[in-house]
From Swiss-Prot:
GO terms for biological process: nucleotide metabolic process; thiamine metabolic process. Its cofactor is Mg(2+); Mn(2+). GO terms for molecular function: ITPase activity; metal ion binding; nucleotide binding; ribonucleoside triphosphate phosphatase activity. Mg(2+) binds at E42, D69. Its EC number is 3.6.1.73. Belongs to the YjjX NTPase family. This is Probable inosine/xanthosine triphosphatase. It comes from Methanothermobacter thermautotrophicus (strain ATCC 29096 / DSM 1053 / JCM 10044 / NBRC 100330 / Delta H) (Methanobacterium thermoautotrophicum). InterPro entries: ITPase-like_fam, Non_canon_purine_NTPase, NTPase/PRRC1, YjjX_NTPase. It catalyses: XTP + H2O = XDP + phosphate + H(+); ITP + H2O = IDP + phosphate + H(+). Pfam families: NTPase_I-T.
Length: 182
């Protein structure tokens, strides 16, 4: 008897290997056999989002725009968010939007604060990635271990941080009856 192998096709609205790997890691644990591929799409927000609305909109746009020939699409967007009582006034959070053609579910990662000089440069119009590349001497740090790895002394890398937001966005899908999903 021939066995049928089921696998889920998932598109990630980015060519960033960290975002693709994090999505594959989390959805592989949940669904087993997944095919995850990166699809370059426009976020529709500035390259360096600032604020909740802009960052979430970027993640949602990426998820919706990547939805083609797949069961789920994923959009991940990192941005600075105003947070009182922090040294710089800002915390970096990654938002994940997961789209199934009907519903969007959202999740967010643990946040961390960039050094003041990084935030100052970003607020002056530069991208975090460019500033962190200069600070660390690592080209395309955000496509590798990430700023969070550098700043945490390697205790958490960008893949792990990104996995957090993907998993949080999956919670309603893992409990569909509790969230009114099909």
């Amino acid at each position: 008897m021939d066995s049928v192998v089921f696998y889920m096709k998932v598109n990630v609205g980015s060519g960033n290997p960290v975002k693709v790997r994090a999505t594959e890691n989390v959805l592989g644990l949940i669904y087993g056999n997944v095919e995850v591929r990166g699809v370059e799409v426009e976020s529709g927000v500035p390259d360096q989002p600032v604020g909740l609305e802009e960052t979430v909109r970027g993640a949602v746009n990426r998820a919706r725009r990547a939805f083609r020939d797949c069961e789920l699409s994923v959009g991940i967007e990192s941005g600075l968010h105003r947070v009182p009582e922090t040294i710089t006034g800002f915390v970096d959070l990654q938002w994940c939007a997961i789209y199934d053609g009907e519903h969007i579910t959202l999740g967010v990662s643990a946040g961390f604060e960039y050094p003041p000089m990084v935030v100052e440069e970003v607020l002056a119009g530069r991208e975090v990635g460019d500033v962190m590349d200069e600070l660390t001497g690592v080209d395309e740090l955000g496509r590798k271990r990430g700023a969070v790895s550098f700043l945490s002394g390697g205790l958490l890398d960008r893949t792990g941080n990104t996995e957090q937001c993907v998993l949080m966005a999956m919670i309603p899908r893992m409990n569909p009856s509790l969230y009114g999903l099909k």
